């Protein structure tokens, strides 16, 4: 249950915790941005260049779904393993090193293939993506998220989660503005881009060996327990659900918001480039939207701890829905009105999404049973990654293929993606209302 933060002095986190959380959190988000956006864009470009635009939707959908399955399964086992070991550091450090190596695998793939090689390349793209996800989920989803929960409490999670929720958009700026010039869909190969990106988590993993420290008092919470399978699936037990109902209500809300985001997220770059016709000029509006939403999210993060999260749930959810709908409405505007809706609507959309997810993540961490920070990361992944990354892309696939029937063989992400996303996000009002009512008690 959320406490009245006004009457509780926030526990200081310390400079080392802040630095490690932000630095390794950012590195993880840079790697995830490459997977969530560039791997999808890469696959879409490869098949568009090869004259198989229809494969763009199918491969993107399979990539997202199978990587979500890999991420969830990995986190379930790795989270429980880190709890039993009583350590997070080796999972983070060695996981980041392996993560970097797996990103470099994409350097082996060309940007255009012959008709006889299309299927093989599709399989390799999906396989490499799943291998990369295994590394990332072990180090980031399981170990790093458990490390954050270990080092925070309900008086300072709002600030830290607010900052952490900004990191994905900062990572987008770093990748697209700082490194995006290395990637070009017209290149024969984008090997240099994937090698450079892969070096970032690889080197960071080596640094983690010297900087990351496990929380004081962290011990092998289930050492001596022989029920390995039971510990692994702790978050899925009936008794765990009954004893921690609000944790699961929070996850349902996060699941709906995540599904809304996944409905359009993998196609966002090509939506700006192709659908809106911005071409290479998409970088400027994306940078403005990212920076603007980062400011919005940061402000909400500090306000959560100062005033309590309860009063912000509904306003931030409304922001999210309105922002998503604004992108759908862009098709009905021109000139200055179109640009204004793109920039303002984008900031409201991404700012709302990130701020709401930050609040829900903090509420989830508040609800974790003591000593089970690693074991519940798997069930968190099930609700925030697996389900959203199955349902969202399927919605995209249906709408995308339907649009191709209208536009011919061209690959043009449709505006209808945002209408569907807004509908899904609106349903989150039900679990959010329950969370808000419980927080008032």
Language-model regions: role of each:
Residues 311-357:
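C-terminal transmembrane helical hairpin of 12-TM major facilitator-type secondary transporters
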Residues 84-97, 306-318:
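Cytoplasmic membrane-interface "Motif A"-like loop-to-helix N-cap segments
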Residues 73-86, 296-309:
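Helix-to-loop junctions at the C-terminal end of transmembrane segments
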